[in-house]
Amino acid sequence: MRGTAMVKRILQYLSLCIVLVSLFILAGCSSNSASSQSKGPEGEWIAYSGYTVQNVVSAVDTPIFILNVKARNDSKTIYTADMKAYNYQYTTPEKRPVIESTQMVGDIKEARLNYITALTLVMSANDIVGNADSSNSNTIKMDITGIPNTALIYDSKTDTIKFMDQTFKRVNETNNLQTLADAYKKDLQVASNKYLEEIGNAANPKTKFITTYNFDDSIIKDNKK
């Protein structure tokens, strides 16, 4: 009898284990299903496409763009977007762009340059209205007068947005204004130093540029207040 009772207990225990395993599997499946569902275009997004020697030569900056997309109705056919752009106002103490500052050096073998620059809000637009495409809800046609190809396209596979030739990713702890500003600073220094080296090597006599960079990111702290 004892042996029979023990067998029953073992079978009951095994049955309980099977039930628990089944529940865990179902929970996992539902979790994976939920995580694989499209999050949609709503939320805060950020984009930065890099700063190269060509930016230095052309004196054209590459801003960091922040985009905030909101649905304005339950059916999510109407959206509004707020957009901001930041870049470093890259000037010398004489308020000259880097490409012009080299022309002020003259024929010397060593030149010291000190660039003091601040991250600056250069563009802000609020409540840009857009309507979802009736055939593709992930495409939102933004109403921006005078600018063609302003469709905001959400890619559910990569959870990114394409808008105005920029690829936006969601803002998070590792992808935000501060982290991209840090990347911008590194790119700016590398590109500028490379350009100055090329200019210096082409000079007669050759000129070595010794450059100091000072960046002011106080606008980021001010935004957090």
Functional labels for PLM-detected ranges:
Residues 4-15:
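Bacterial N-terminal signal peptides that target proteins for export
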Residues 30-46:
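N-terminal helix-cap/turn-to-beta initiation motif at the start of protein domains
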Residues 47, 76-85, 142, 161-164:
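Short hydrophobic/aromatic-rich beta-strand segments that constitute the beta-sheet cores
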Residues 78, 131-133, 138-144, 152-154:
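A composition-driven surface/loop motif
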Residues 25-28:
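C-terminal motif of bacterial Sec signal peptides marking the signal peptidase cleavage site
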Residues 55-124, 128:
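N-terminal glycine/threonine-rich, aromatic-flanked beta-hairpin/loop signature
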Residues 99-113, 127, 146-150, 156-225:
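Edge beta-strand at a domain terminus
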Residues 48-53:
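N-terminal "first-domain core" detector
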